[in-house]
Amino acid sequence: PPRSTLFPYTTLFRSGELKEEEISWWQDLWYEGMGEFRYLNGLLGVSKESWVSFSYKKESEKKLHDFSKLSGNLIAFTGGKDSSLSLSILKDEIPESETFSINPPENIEKIRNFFGFGDRPSIIISRKMGYFILSANEKGALNGHTPFSAIVAMIGMFVASLRDKKYVIVSNEGSADEETVFGTGINHQYSKSLIFEKKFREYCNLVWENGPEYFSLLRPLTEIGIFKMFKKYEDILPEISSCNKKEKQGTWCGKCGKCLFAFLVFSAVWDIKFAKKITGKDMLSDTGNLNLLKELAGVSPT
């Protein structure tokens, strides 16, 4: 990659030995997981082998956790519509279920209470972006999506081992398997895809035996199907946001692709009046959203 990125060229593991299959897995994750980054920054010609390398230094051998007493579910909960739907589906298994959240919205307990999880453990994880990344962006460093959902998966497996939970449940749906860059096979949400899920499960089986199992509960569903299932949960919808910029406050910026997409589906499943009520915006009347609309419709580059 060009030197205008902060992405590391090599990563050194200091505990234990890396098998060839593990090295291949990590290379695959960071190459495929940054597919949109490579596309947007003109780096599609860079090979997987030269994108990043992994090595190890066997300084210590770590003893793995005892997985003989695993039971119950650990649910990744963001406070958004997808993970909220998972709570609604799993509410009857509450005694065996806990949630974990990374930088959750301020109203997350209100949503958990609505779905009957108020008296169940909630593990809160704080994650901060390094200041040098933000300053590098301001100076023109290349930017783009990273495989964040893979980070969520790893954190989930770690927390599950600490909490002795058998299943790590996420809420990735079917559209993560559809390419967003025509003819390339690239989806910016690679680490939400079924192929990643399968490879991650294979990786976990490679490095430990009988550990927690990772899977997505909503894989068979489409986006519009998820919205339709929320018909019976309209009372909580004003508390749920899918906006990356305003999700912390549980509101909508009305200027990003996620906001506009949600507005369109709210309009399709309910009506445009309902979409305005939930988001507090009239996004289709905002001419500043025209390019976003073209991207969502597939008539301009992502």
Regions inferred by a protein language model and the residue ranges of each:
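Short, well-ordered junction/capping motifs at the entry into regular secondary structure
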Residues: P1-R3
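Contiguous, well-ordered alpha-helical segments that form the cores/surfaces of helical PPI scaffolds
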Residues: S84-I89, A150-F158, K228, K258-V265
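RNA-binding accessory domains that recognize and position tRNA/RNA substrates
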Residues: L6-N73, S84, I89-G130, E138-A141, ...
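ATP-dependent adenylate-handling ligase core
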Residues: N103-P238
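Charged/polar, low-hydrophobicity segments characteristic of intrinsically disordered regions
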Residues: G35-Y39, G183-Y203, T287-T302
